[in-house]
């Protein structure tokens, strides 16, 4: 009997695992429970909504000239939305330091905190390719440390791949070592937020001949290191077009114009979650707000505040738990015996009001 129960438990666990793109489905993985993605939004989900997106999927889209969709998200609810919309890639970015935690830069966030975000996203998104950022300080010092950090992102964070910022030779070497360890890597060139100390702030790149050439050279170096894709951030459209043409791997643009292989925006930004993003004084010039969720949220919170202050919430329809009138009497008597006369009166008064509203069940 015990053996049968164990077999049944193992079968149930296998059904609940989220298959990763880089490990066989039969591998031991205590991953998150799959969501129902069969009813994914029609605008982009299509017939293949339930099929896992892999690096091979992206290569196929790139080969066919089909744009790749990427959204940066940081938690379970946003991951569920990204998943149901049929987005190709969900990137768990180190920009969580700014968007979620309120820092001025991406530098403060640690690998351990990033792993928490990765796990939350992995529980919510079962269809997209999941890519986790390597935060500043966890991969630059040596290839060994880079590989160790990347392994944690997959094993502990439940990601399919990692992203790292390119530029310095040490970062290119880190990318190469991680790929050689069997982990898919997405590169990142142009404005690399982890290097703002060198760049002098969040400034567009590729606006001079030398800077533009460096963007293309770095992208090519990341491709040579084995990256399956490269993010191009805040570079002029001609520079992004040149990099896209020069590379054999997909480019993902953010503030890089329409000539990239795909596009990425931050979940909070594209939804208009706030009047302006917390991590910017104004909405980034490259960010189109596809919604005005922030206005809806503010309106709902204001209405909640007003209804609480006027005592109109909660009303009868949101006070679902009942107690019979006879039990209220017994409860009041018990309170009086405890010397809590005012509490007994409060209970009786509440019951009387509920009875007027037809809330209180009849005595049995």
UniProtKB/Swiss-Prot annotation:
Its EC number is 2.1.2.11. InterPro entries: Pantoate_hydroxy_MeTrfase, Pyrv/PenolPyrv_kinase-like_dom, Pyrv_kinase-like_dom_sf. Residues 1-59 form a transit peptide. GO terms for cellular component: mitochondrion. It comes from Oryza sativa subsp. japonica (Rice). GO terms for molecular function: 3-methyl-2-oxobutanoate hydroxymethyltransferase activity; magnesium ion binding. 3-methyl-2-oxobutanoate binds at residues 94-95, 133, 163. Keywords: Magnesium, Metal-binding, Mitochondrion, Pantothenate biosynthesis, Transferase, Transit peptide. The keyword Mitochondrion applies. The keyword S-adenosyl-L-methionine does not apply. The active site is at 233 (proton acceptor). Belongs to the PanB family. One of its GO terms (biological process) is pantothenate biosynthetic process. It catalyses: 3-methyl-2-oxobutanoate + (6R)-5,10-methylene-5,6,7,8-tetrahydrofolate + H2O = 2-dehydropantoate + (6S)-5,6,7,8-tetrahydrofolate. Its cofactor is Mg(2+). Binds 1 Mg(2+) ion per subunit. The gene is KPHMT1. This is 3-methyl-2-oxobutanoate hydroxymethyltransferase 1, mitochondrial. It comes from the Eukaryota. Its main location: mitochondrion. It is found in: Mitochondrion. It is an enzyme of class 2 (transferase). HAMAP family: PanB. Catalyzes the reversible reaction in which hydroxymethyl group from 5,10-methylenetetrahydrofolate is transferred onto alpha-ketoisovalerate to form ketopantoate. Pathway: Cofactor biosynthesis; (R)-pantothenate biosynthesis; (R)-pantoate from 3-methyl-2-oxobutanoate: step 1/2. The lineage of its organism: Eukaryota, Viridiplantae, Streptophyta, Embryophyta, Tracheophyta. SUPFAM superfamilies: Phosphoenolpyruvate/pyruvate domain. Mg(2+) binds at residues 94, 133, 165.
